[in-house]
Every structure is written in structure tokens, then in C-alpha cells.
């Protein structure tokens, strides 16, 4: 059986990530070459030996001294090796990568942290991270939604709804002329778009739900929450006013741990019955659950 669309997306992204970033732990430093070998020194050489060897090789391969193109390429490698080994921090990281080549991700992170960490603006890094995460989040949401829609469209209930809507639109008359198959297919697509598909757990993707957008709107959200809470305290704690229908519904829904969309799908009579029970009060809620347990046992 083929994996679901969402899993295939995730697998493809993981493989792409691995293909881009996973490589030899030491290759990120001097490529396929050994940094010490490029400078002609041993791994335990001191800083003076490394510096002396670099200047000696510079006299032979520097572009100003040697115009040969191959020598120019070699000098670039030598200069790179010297930049890595002259600094105690990067040299220690390189030595660790040699000793622990299996720790690919750690060694790679250490390298780029040392190379770019001090040059990067934390704000730019944060923005970039939010953009990347939001992009992945949106792609995942779209994949999940399309997969859920495709699943629903294969159910008998959906097909019956579509057939009923088609009969209503055409008056029960089918087109048997040439090309009717294409016309019927187009009509089905139009009717399918008219059907309101409410799929729990796979709502239509919205930019307002993205992590980056929520982060940008965080100050507004906090202010809005503080205003709402202050109004609640003033109205119901200080003035002791009776709960409005909306607020009583909110308290009831929160007491029963019912999601907003599930509450919206309840009929008005059921909502009114639950609100009148004042389930936000502990004793009333306990009595309600006790009644539900008794009712469940009775039905068995």
C-alpha cells in the first residue's frame, strides 16, 4: 500500500534535506583534502609551525608569485586550511570532526556556527526561521487538507449528496448528446465546489494560522486578551452581572472541553439545555457527569 500523501511529502522533504546537508564531517572544512596535509604539517604541529609552513607555501603558490592556474587553485585551498588551523577554536572543531566523523550534524552545526554565527543578525535569523517554518507548515496543511478532501469524495455519503444536487440542478434530465461525458464531468466539478465540506481536523489552510503570522500578531493578541480579561473581571467579578449568552456558552464549552467547531454544530435546544445547567460551577458539573454515567450504564 502506498503511503499517505502527507507521509510522502514528509519523506521527500527529509530526503531532500539529507541530500543537501549530509556529507563527510571533514569535507565542510577543506573539501576532500586534509587541512594539515595541505599545509604539510602534522596534526600535533604548533601554531608557529603552521604559520611558517603557510608563508613558505605562499611564496611558491601565491598568484603574484606563480601565474599558473593550477597553482592559483592550490593556493586557495592552502589559504582555507590556514584560516581553519590558525584559529584555536576552529582547529579544535576540525580535530574533533576528524576523531568523530560519525557526528555529522553536530560537526556541521559547529562549523557554520563558527563561520557565520558572529556575522548573523539574530533578528534576520529569527525572520528567516519563521518564514521557513511557516512555508513547511502551509505545505503540510495543504497536503493534509487535499488528502482529507479526496478521502471524503470517495465516501458513499458524499456521492449521494453530489447526485442529489446534480438532479436538483438538471431536473433529473441527463444529457445524452455527443460530448455529454465531458459536460457531466464539468458539471460534477462545479457541483463539488458548491458542496460545503466540513472535515474535522483538516480545515481549509489559512495564512492566519501560520506560525509567522501569529508571531507578528502576538502583541495585538496579547493586548486583545488583556482587554477581554479586564472586561470580564469588571463585569462579572466586580459588578456581579449575570453572564451573557455568549459568555455562558463559552464557560459551558470550556467546562465540557468541547472544541468551538463542535459546539457550533450542536442544535440550539441542546446548547440552551447545557447552558441552563450552569456547568461552570463545580457541583453542577459533577452532577452532570454522574447523570451521564448512569445514563450510559442504563443503556447497556
Curated annotation (Swiss-Prot):
Residues 28-122, 228-300 are lumenal. One of its GO terms (biological process) is protein folding. It is found in: Endoplasmic reticulum membrane. Residues 1-27 form the signal peptide. It comes from the Eukaryota. It is a multi-pass membrane protein. Keywords: Chaperone, Endoplasmic reticulum, Glycoprotein, Membrane, Signal, Transmembrane, Transmembrane helix. The chain crosses the membrane at residues 123-143, 207-227. SUPFAM superfamilies: Chaperone J-domain. GO terms for cellular component: endoplasmic reticulum; endoplasmic reticulum membrane; nucleus. Residues 34-98 form the J domain. Glycans are attached at residues 46, 88. Its main location: endoplasmic reticulum. Residues 144-206 are cytoplasmic. Expressed in leaves, flower buds and flowers. PANTHER family: DNAJ HOMOLOG SUBFAMILY C MEMBER 25. May play a role in protein folding in the endoplasmic reticulum. This is Chaperone protein dnaJ 50. It comes from Arabidopsis thaliana (Mouse-ear cress). The lineage of its organism: Eukaryota, Viridiplantae, Streptophyta, Embryophyta, Tracheophyta. The gene is C50.
Amino acid at each position: 500500500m502506498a503511503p499517505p500523501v502527507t507521509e510522502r511529502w514528509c519523506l521527500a522533504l527529509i530526503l531532500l534535506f539529507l541530500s543537501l546537508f549530509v556529507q563527510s564531517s571533514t569535507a565542510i572544512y577543506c573539501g576532500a583534502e586534509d587541512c594539515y596535509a595541505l599545509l604539510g604539517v602534522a596534526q600535533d604541529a604548533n601554531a608557529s609551525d603552521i604559520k611558517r609552513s603557510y608563508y613558505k607555501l605562499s611564496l611558491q603558490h601565491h598568484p603574484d608569485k606563480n601565474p599558473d592556474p593550477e597553482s592559483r587553485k592550490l593556493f586557495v585551498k592552502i589559504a582555507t586550511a590556514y584560516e581553519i588551523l590558525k584559529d584555536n577554536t576552529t582547529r579544535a572543531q576540525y580535530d574533533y570532526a576528524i576523531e568523530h566523523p560519525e557526528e555529522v550534524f553536530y560537526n556541521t552545526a559547529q562549523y557554520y556556527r563558527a563561520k557565520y554565527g558572529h556575522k548573523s543578525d539574530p533578528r534576520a535569523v529569527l525572520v528567516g526561521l519563521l518564514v521557513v517554518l511557516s512555508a513547511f507548515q502551509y505545505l503540510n496543511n495543504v497536503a493534509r487538507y487535499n488528502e482529507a478532501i479526496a478521502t471524503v469524495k470517495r465516501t458513499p455519503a458524499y456521492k449521494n449528496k453530489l447526485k442529489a444536487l446534480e438532479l436538483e440542478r438538471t431536473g433529473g434530465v441527463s444529457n445524452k448528446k455527443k460530448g455529454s461525458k465531458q459536460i457531466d464531468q464539468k458539471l460534477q466539478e462545479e457541483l463539488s465546489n458548491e458542496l460545503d465540506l466540513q472535515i474535522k481536523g483538516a480545515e481549509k489552510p489559512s495564512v492566519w494560522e501560520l506560525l509567522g503570522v501569529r508571531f507578528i500578531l502576538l502583541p495585538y493578541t496579547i493586548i486583545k486578551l488583556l482587554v477581554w480579561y479586564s472586561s470580564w473581571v469588571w463585569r462579572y467579578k466586580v459588578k456581579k452581572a449575570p453572564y451573557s449568552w455568549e459568555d455562558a456558552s463559552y464557560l459551558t464549552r470550556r467546562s465540557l472541553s468541547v472544541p468551538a467547531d463542535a459546539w457550533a454544530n450542536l442544535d440550539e435546544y441542546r446548547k440552551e439545555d447545557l447552558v441552563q445547567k450552569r456547568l461552570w460551577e463545580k457541583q453542577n458539573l459533577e452532577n452532570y457527569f454522574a447523570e451521564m454515567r448512569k445514563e450510559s450504564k442504563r443503556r447497556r
